[in-house]
Design a protein with these regions (language model features):
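Polar, low-complexity export/assembly segments characteristic of proteins
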Residues: 2-186
């Protein structure tokens, strides 16, 4: 996406959300989320968060990049991160819960770095952004937190991939009945 970002064309936060949730673009809408099982949400959110982290790693954080696109991409990342924390934390799978806790700890670990960009880490691990402060941050400062070599995005992608995998396993078990209690009395 770095090619698109440097073309001078401004892409909206919704564009990035649709891109992150490309398998099921309705999943970032509150009305759809209310009607969807938590297992499915955890899977879709993990997949979307992995895409979001990779997207942020793909930007060239230089003065030539379109800062508005980077800002909108980060805002969409934050929405996706928050969705993932909520669905993972509410999952019945202990594995999925574990990776949601890792994500929560990760955001707290990097809260000072995020705060310097105008991003507040709440007590539950979710994030909120001050768009004005984020937009005024230097590209190099943003790149230190979200760039290709940044530990925060690397770890986010790692935990999201593991959460997606465990959620997929849970969905498969629910669909096939594997892992269920089997009554051997006949």
């Amino acid at each position: 996406m770095s090619t698109v970002a440097s073309t001078g064309m401004s892409l909206s936060q919704n564009y990035y959300l649709r891109s992150y949730y490309q398998n099921n673009q309705k999943m970032f809408k509150a009305s759809t989320r209310k009607e969807t099982s938590n297992s499915r949400l955890s899977y879709e959110d993990g997949l979307a968060l992995r895409r979001a982290a990779r997207n942020l790693q793909s930007f060239e954080y230089s003065k030539n990049d379109n800062g508005e696109n980077i800002c909108n991409s980060i805002l969409a990342f934050i929405d996706t991160y928050n969705n993932t924390l909520k669905s993972g934390g509410a999952s019945s799978s202990s594995d999925v819960n574990r990776y949601a806790r890792h994500l929560k700890q990760l955001s707290h670990k990097y809260s000072d770095d995020l705060s310097s960009l105008g991003i507040t880490v709440n007590t539950d691990g979710t994030m909120t952004a001050n768009k004005n402060l984020l937009g005024k941050s230097s590209a190099s400062d943003v790149g230190k937190v979200f760039g290709k070599e940044a530990d925060f995005t690397k770890k986010t992608e790692q935990y999201a991939r593991k959460m997606e995998s465990k959620s997929s396993d849970s969905l498969y078990a629910a669909l096939t009945g594997s892992g269920s209690n089997i009554d051997f009395q006949a």
